[in-house]
Amino acid sequence: FQACASEKPNIILVLLDDVSPDMFSCYAPYTPKGAEHAGNTPNIDKLASEGVMFKTCYAAAMCAPTRVELVTGRYANATGVYQNGMWSKERSAYFLEDFPSIGKLLKDAGYATAIAGKWHEGAIRPYEEQGGFDEYCIWSGLSLMEKCDNFKGWSGGMENETTISRYWNPGLIKNGKVLYTKEDDFGPEICNRFLIDFMERSVKKGQPFFAYWPCVAPHGTRQGITTNPFRGKVGEMGKSNPEESAARFKSLNEYIDFLIGRMSAKLEELGVEDNTLFIITSDNGTAVTAKTRGVERGCHVVNVISGYNVKKRGATEELTDFTDIAPTLVEIAGATPPEGYQFDGVSLVPFISGDKDTHREWIYGYISTSQVIRTKEYLIEVLNPMLGLPEGRFCYTGENRFREGYIRAEGLPEHEEARQKLLKIAEQFPPVTTAHPFWDTRRGEAFYKDYTSEASRLKHLHNHKDWIYYNED
């Protein structure tokens, strides 16, 4: 099934869940704890070496805002989605009524579209018109399962009393039907197999495909880190000792790498590897040590792009953030956004294709009311008037990318011009303050009470104790 060069390229987009770059062997040489933490990820490593691996890519520092940013190409100041519990506009949950989904744009451009895994993007489902996905296999709760005409109760896997399993014996809805799984069925493997089947059918039909895999892994369960087909007992999803939990987490990343390798192998089998763009990224940094924190590590994620029309660069110092993904896919697919619609991001096509050797001067990350802005040599993190840091924490990073070697630079005259430049960029994104109407809502009141507590404030404004490499006072 050899694809012609004149055909539109296929696209695979893999979004991993709760994992920092230091967990991947291709990033290990650049990260301070890479040798200790990284699993063996040869398939991702191969894609990185044959394409582009961004040392510095920013998402948001939590699941929902990142996913919204990815499918819309817009920051939270536009969509109103700042945190899982902070959908700040009256109809933020229905953001796809105002912001086109990348799935819908590619479908309208003639692509077969499929999604498998975790949606977590508000009230509009990916299979509805605004979502744009033709086929789906989604981890779901009981309320959605009950709407399926083949629903006959659920006796499968549970993570706790209320959460249906995403891993062993998982709860999935596949194209409108509850998928009743077995005890030894593993959610990521099912989703991977679903997308590979979709890819093969699309190639046979001669239709370009967009396969979006927002994978549930390696996110923990409600009780702990799961076992997986590479490690541990089938069905075990509860707590274990710290050493075993760390080993499971590393092993789970290695298993996901194995599944990514299966996708690469299928592309080769179908003869379309050179006509398929392959992107691997993650929604936020690792839970506990990075996720939800307003520091750089919270929003610093893996980003590997390989395949169709991608120049072999390997690790790059160029910067990118999640708003770049949508305009990149739109350009590659020849899709057309609605008239007047403007992405916040910039298409990566000129850089990844080799037409240009630079991409953009600065990138932007956020979580809750904190903002993070970076250039190649400077960083402002936890810019957060609500929590007492109206100008954030300013660092000179030089050529460093993973916190080691950063120098606090407030008050140093030789760096003041750069600090003012970052603050000027921040003016484009007015921070959320106590005057925001969200805090007057019931959800906002509850969020505010927890968020501004001393314990939450200290966690949010600082790195985890094992990841402090510069003065944070």
Give the residues covered by each predicted segment:
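Formylglycine-dependent sulfatase
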Residues: 3-392, 397-473
